[in-house]
Amino acid sequence: MQLVSKIARTIGRVLKLNEDLIEAISLGHDIGHVPYGHFGEKILSELCEKNGIGKFHHNVQSIQFLDVIENCDLTLQVLDGILCHNGESHNKNLKPTGTLSWDSFQSKIEAIKGKEKKDPFPVTIEGCVVRIADTIAYLGRDLQDAIEVNLIPQDLNIIPKKCIELFEIKNWKEINWSVLDVLIKDVINNSYDQDSISFSDDVSMSIQEFYKFNMENIYNSEKLKKDSAKIRFMYTTLFEHFMADLDKENKESLIYPDMKELDWISSEYKKNTTRPEIVRDYIAGMTDRYFEFVFNKITIPDRVKRRYT
């Protein structure tokens, strides 16, 4: 989140854009991400569909948190930028698209949730900057992190040669810095005094190669998949447990003090939200660490302490 903000503000400052808008979009863009990343999102989406509330989308969930649950009264420009921030979908050129209206914004939400799985562009140039910063932020960082935790070897020869040359990578400890430096400068050079935010042709092609490498060696790694059954079990356990607690109105359940009874949650939300939606929002708002804490809390008996006299 902070890295995306720094990258986007750096680009926005040189291009003389609205840095406050860029900062607001950046800080809210990943609020909807769930425990255990993309695999966690996949499982939660399946559970949501099974319970009749449709697929889960982390960008739509960010809007759910900020505009529905907490009713933060953010501007339409900020909400639109957060909704359309998806930098994982690579685009060589990003140009503001659509009209700035609440009806248009709602149509974008429905398009994302629909069968065609559309991925709309932001309506502001600042939103486009954040989206391209999202692409820049994770590309080199994910690879360097994967090397640091021994997910892949410390061997630059396994990285596509074109990427090594273009990003001028000298050793694995400088991967992220090298990628950031080249991509930020390229975006600025190709976007200055333009009505869109763009990469050059060579850089855009290298990004696609880099992403393909990361997908095969990191995101779809067999080492990461080995715990997938455990994560699925944890998600299913939590979802079913809290659904049952809401059915029984079990006020001792964590979902009541953590979610349902919070005084800063919108009264409209409390009145109009279904049980599966409440459970979805509760789980989606957890960090990995709290997710694990809650799972242990509801599955492991409390230890009875012996008293010595």
Residue ranges and their predicted role:
Residues G37-K50:
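A glycine- and small-aliphatic-rich helix-loop capping segment at beta-alpha/alpha-beta transitions
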Residues L3-I11, L15-D20, G40, K55-F56, ...:
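Histidine-centered, transition-metal-coordinating active-site segments
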Residues M1, G32-H33, N51-K55:
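Short secondary-structure transition/capping motifs
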Residues A24-I25:
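Active-site alpha-helix of zinc metalloproteases
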Residues G28, G32-Y36, A137:
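Short active-site segment of divalent metal-dependent hydrolases/proteases
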